[in-house]
Amino acid sequence: MKLEQCIVGRDHTDPRKWHHGDGRDGREHRTAPGLVGGSLAGRDPPVERARGDGDGGHEFMSVVVEGGELREQLLGLRIGIEEDRHRDERQAHHRPYRRSTRCTAGSLYIGDFIAGRTTVVGAIGAGPPSQRRFAFPEVNDCGPSSNIFAKCCAPGTILFGNIFDLPNFPRMSDVRAGSNDPPGKYLCLTICGYRKPGMSEEDYRHHMTKISAPMTKDLMVKYGIKRWTMIHSPAVTRTLMDQLYDSQMVNLADFDCFSQVVFKSVEDYKRMKEDPYYKEHLFKDHEHFADTKKSLFVHFMPLPPPLGPCPGS
């Protein structure tokens, strides 16, 4: 995917406010052709950063790329938010998409222009210090889309981090109403979990299988969960990947647990999470052995019935 322009900013409730502004160097900053007019032709160097005030006084920082693959041209976007978050903003300015802006829950919006013609808008709420992956509510018919890593580092402050291409990102317009429960199919929630920092693999496995699992299984049955699996992935088994390495098997996953929950309706799983026992015991128990700030969740995936027994689960 080729990225021609990205813009981030503060309280962008109106996309028209992103279209232009005066950069600090006095030059007018315009969007890519096909949006509001203007041209990026002839700009040098290929990657250019400009900061200024857009319509209504909204600060923004933009990155302009004239051609080139995203991963090749914008390697500077792959930054470590945690290590950078206490740096003075001036020191961080040489890195694209590295700046902070104030926000309140539900009021901050981020936007970018994909392929120089498409506006993507997503609402973000302030929250606890944790890295989050955001899916945008609408991608206006642009095909392959993008996503942004953001980190809430302090109340009212958010730091923007990596932007990367996410092929075949689904548009909300493609998702039919009620399609969370497709007829005749089960749903599967997949979780890639990490153990609590400082906890040994032995203690992690013991807590997961001997303490957490027994507390969970009866509740799963109560709410009609069809299958539940928790698979521990210790570091020693990852070394086996050395024997399977080839050009198609290069990247090694680092999660400690792979878990799947299969159910008929998403409402069943939601009701289980609302159960007083879950809130009082299971929710708190997760913090005792899991690094919940790093856990990754995959969208619900339909599975065809019937499901047979799952030995050892």
UniProtKB/Swiss-Prot annotation:
Annotated InterPro entries: Dimeric_a/b-barrel (IPR011008), EthD_dom (IPR009799)
Species this chain originates from: Aspergillus terreus (strain NIH 2624 / FGSC A1156)
Gene Ontology MF term list: lyase activity; oxidoreductase activity
Compositional bias annotation for Basic and acidic residues: 1-31, 45-56
Function (record text): Decarboxylase; part of the gene cluster that mediates the biosynthesis of geodin, an intermediate in the biosynthesis of other natural products. The pathway begins with the synthesis of atrochrysone thioester by the polyketide synthase (PKS) gedC. The atrochrysone carboxyl ACP thioesterase gedB then breaks the thioester bond and releases the atrochrysone carboxylic acid from gedC. The atrochrysone carboxylic acid is then converted to atrochrysone which is further transformed into emodin anthrone.
Keywords on record: Lyase
The EthD domain, residue ranges: 197-292
Protein name: Decarboxylase gedI
Region (Disordered): 1-56
Catalytic activity annotation: atrochrysone carboxylate + H(+) = atrochrysone + CO2
E.C. designation(s): 4.1.1.-
Family indicated by similarity: Belongs to the tpcK family.
Matching Pfam families: EthD (PF07110)
